[in-house]
């Protein structure tokens, strides 16, 4: 065990977070996301919500400030609707952890899948919220 690491962050996920460079993206997917079809590097976080993972990741992760929106979520398919509480809960979780909220953008379902293919890794969570997937983009970690 390490001090200060949230219990939702597995050793495999901690390794991935440390390996990622600036500009790399991480997909936090819901339980139904086709991760293994889209990507070769998949970590399982079964039974863990995306909010729990964001609580653990945000203090360890510098969100990209060189891109317009370092957070990306899927937009609703035509004729379907989003629950705005899902996005708001993610943003509030990040704000609580780091004090500010990076900008969030939405993209079409299939564009999101294509973007996920280019990510550093995909984390399959226990999240069941509709359109609950989120991509987070890592920035440059400041040297202190």
From Swiss-Prot:
Pathway: Carbohydrate metabolism; L-fucose metabolism. Keywords: Carbohydrate metabolism, Cytoplasm, Fucose metabolism, Isomerase. Its EC number is 5.1.3.29. It is an enzyme of class 5 (isomerase). The keyword Lipid metabolism does not apply. GO terms for molecular function: fucose binding; L-fucose mutarotase activity. Its main location: cytoplasm. The keyword Hydrolase does not apply. Transmembrane segments: none annotated. One of its GO terms (cellular component) is cytoplasm. It comes from the Bacteria. InterPro entries: L-fucose_mutarotase, RbsD-like_sf, RbsD/FucU_mutarotase, RbsD_FucU. Gene3D superfamilies: RbsD-like domain. It is found in: Cytoplasm. The active site is at residue 22. Substrate binds at residues 30, 109, 131-133. GO terms for biological process: fucosylation; L-fucose metabolic process. Involved in the anomeric conversion of L-fucose. NCBIfam families: PRK15420.1. Homodecamer. Belongs to the RbsD / FucU family. FucU mutarotase subfamily. PANTHER family: FUCOSE MUTAROTASE. This is L-fucose mutarotase. The gene is fucU.
